[in-house]
Amino acid sequence: MNDQGIKESIETLKEQIRKYDYHYYVLDEPLVPDAEYDRCFKALQQYEEQYPQFLSPDSPTQRVSGTPSDAFMPVAHKQPMLSLSNVFTIDELKAFIKRAIEKLDEPNQQLVFACEPKLDGLAVNMTYEGGILTHAATRGDGAVGENITANIKTIASVPLRLRVSNPPKLIEVRGEVYIPKADFEAYNARARELGEKTFANPRNAAAGSLRQLNPEISASRPLAIYCYSIGACEDYKLPNSHLEQLNLLKEFGFRVSPETRRAIGVEGCLDYYQYMLAKRNQLPFEIDGVVYKIDSISLQQQLGYVSRAPRFACAHKFPATEEMTRLIAVDFQVGRTGAVTPVARLEPVSVGGVTVSNATLHNFDEITRKDIRIGDTVIIRRAGDVIPEVVSVILEKRPINARKIELPKNCPVCGSEVVREADEAIARCIGGLYCKAQLKRMMWHFASRKAMYIEGLGSVLIDQLVDEGIVHHLADLYELDLQTLANLPRMGEKSAKNLLSALEKSKKTTFNRFLYALGIREIGEAGARVLAEHYCDVESLKSATIEELMTLNDIGPVAASHVVHFFAQAHNLEVIDRLLELGIHWPKPEKIQVNQQNPFFGKTVVLTGTLSAMGREEAKAKLLALGAKVSGSVSSKTDYVIAGSEAGSKLIKATELGVAIIEEDEFLKWVNS
């Protein structure tokens, strides 16, 4: 083959791989099996090794490379990359729009806005010349940023070449690099396991990952990007609408936020603000507000800029999720398994529109790692329904009399000894069900929906039953009578009858629900199901050894030792015997023959998004019946991801890891066959 033929073969392979990458990473529509992709990629690598004269910087094989020699060298933006002015109230938004209308000298004009979520990530500028990515930079001071080209190339959804046959001579594409929330939590959890540094928040994680001297470190981080505007553009006619320019970016091969909307006037902008504020906690990524941009590019050009911000756009910030306050004391709460958790008492402060006076400190390892002391000025975070937490200490504000936090020697509830094993971060009260705090939490767990499901037995009633000495252990619940219950404050005869009916109804259960309800440490729903499938009744389970238990899927040495320890305790066996005597029972499980030829047998499967044909729990049950293991997170060990509509970060991570994606229609064919 002559040089021309070789070059044509290389270009054909590059174009094929770009097409596969675009469908896989951007559209989430894989065109070919992994093996075919790998074959094409390897063929391209071999060509480029044999004929290095045809190796080009836009080749898919150059997405991850060694340490760049020009790391963090300054890069000037062709068009300034300015920050947005912020508004925080409705009045400020009205004033911003009023100023724009007055500047345009069209007092009766209803302005049309492009509205977008304001991602809390790192802004970047990517420059393409002749359709090829030549360099990328951070925002920097707006005029000059840092060269992060090699690191940007590690983000799979960033096209190395634009997907058009007639690209602009030069174009700057602006976007926000971020780490999805689920991936951030998984990364930090893994880092903690390995004793490595964790990140305070997803934005810091994204920024730190992009500013790595070694691009391979960036490649190992779950970075993603949404593009939001065009900077300089040469020899190409752009649409006169910001929303249409975003559609053009999609055609070029970029990811654009699906939450972008068109709005008219103040009311339209405020509707979008409320919509995104309500949806904020369900999004797979962090946002700290919304952005309004006048949609007309010609109007944008008329308005121009003031100082270092555009007159045609602003950011409407959400109430802060992080605030600063003073830690004035530490109390200790006792959980179901005796875990003693430190809780910070704070000078009340408004965070995200809610007054916060308490925050979790997690455990003593976290207190030591963050060096938190009583009297410190601390930063607290409240995100959605998550319990507020102390994120960090502002050491410059530490008073001379700041006191170290001491682990109590005795339980604050029952006075029993508090112990902490050498290999555990958590300290525990050894009082067991003698401790009222543990008994209350145990009863609440026992009565919960996924356990015995005793409707009407809530935390207030549990407090009454325990505090007044009516209930001393779980079995006492099933010996309650109408008169005792009806005489309780705010109870009454009708409520008492309803509770007794719920208790009677709960007696018919399943073995796995009963095991889960017992609250054995390290045994959750999945572990209880595994034990129930293998042992069928209490008698056979209580004689199991650690070695036997460890042969079961999902039962490791720690869980196995807790199971053996639980059934070795005489008082636990007494409670179980009494519960069974009082009528708790379950049908003997039928041996179901699973077709081991089905594609899910023995595989690890993750569900994501919304399935139209069934709920998440029903889908999970069907997968378990097919012999699958259902996991809540995507990793390299995941075999399949079943994707419904509005799938988020799990789907992104699956595509980045090369995990097979199964659409709902294909899934339904198997479960209904």
UniProtKB/Swiss-Prot annotation:
NAD(+) binds at residues 34-38, 83-84, 116, 139, 176, 293, 317. Zn(2+) binds at residues 411, 414, 429, 435. Its cofactor is Mg(2+); Mn(2+). Residues 595-673 form the BRCT domain. One of its GO terms (cellular component) is cytosol. The keyword DNA repair applies. It catalyses: NAD(+) + (deoxyribonucleotide)n-3'-hydroxyl + 5'-phospho-(deoxyribonucleotide)m = (deoxyribonucleotide)n+m + AMP + beta-nicotinamide D-nucleotide. The active site is at 118 (n6-amp-lysine intermediate). One of its GO terms (biological process) is DNA replication. Belongs to the NAD-dependent DNA ligase family. LigA subfamily. PANTHER family: CHROMOSOME TRANSMISSION FIDELITY FACTOR 18 (PTHR23389), DNA LIGASE (PTHR23389:SF9). This is DNA ligase. The gene is ligA.
